[in-house]
Amino acid sequence: PQQIPDHEILCAGFPCQPFSQAGHKQGFNDTRGTLFFQIEKIIRCKMPKAFLLENVKGLKGHDKGRTFQIIIDTLEAIGYNVKTKILAAKDFNLPQNRERIYIVGFLNPQHAQKFEFPKALEKTIRYVMGRTSA
């Protein structure tokens, strides 16, 4: 982590296969599932003002929620105020039905308090496509 340049915001994802419906759901027992802890090391070393992590929505319920709770507890123990939400790409006019969990954290509790996840757009991709075809 020391070789990574300092930064104010960390955006990262870790392999989803260990937590995915399509995968074998081995979680932290799958080597790929432990890559979250590499992200944790970077966060601990660099202490960015904020981070954004994303993964499959199945992460939240994996191992009856224990895996997700370990992740949240780990990030909060470092000193971050953490918020999470499942968002669907289709709700933001992207042509795919893909739900992901987003985990955001802020060192400053006031920033966390002000942060709001985006709300679904009212116009659907079907609406947009219908308006552009002639």
PLM segments and residue spans:
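Class I S-adenosyl-L-methionine
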Residues: 2-9, 16-134
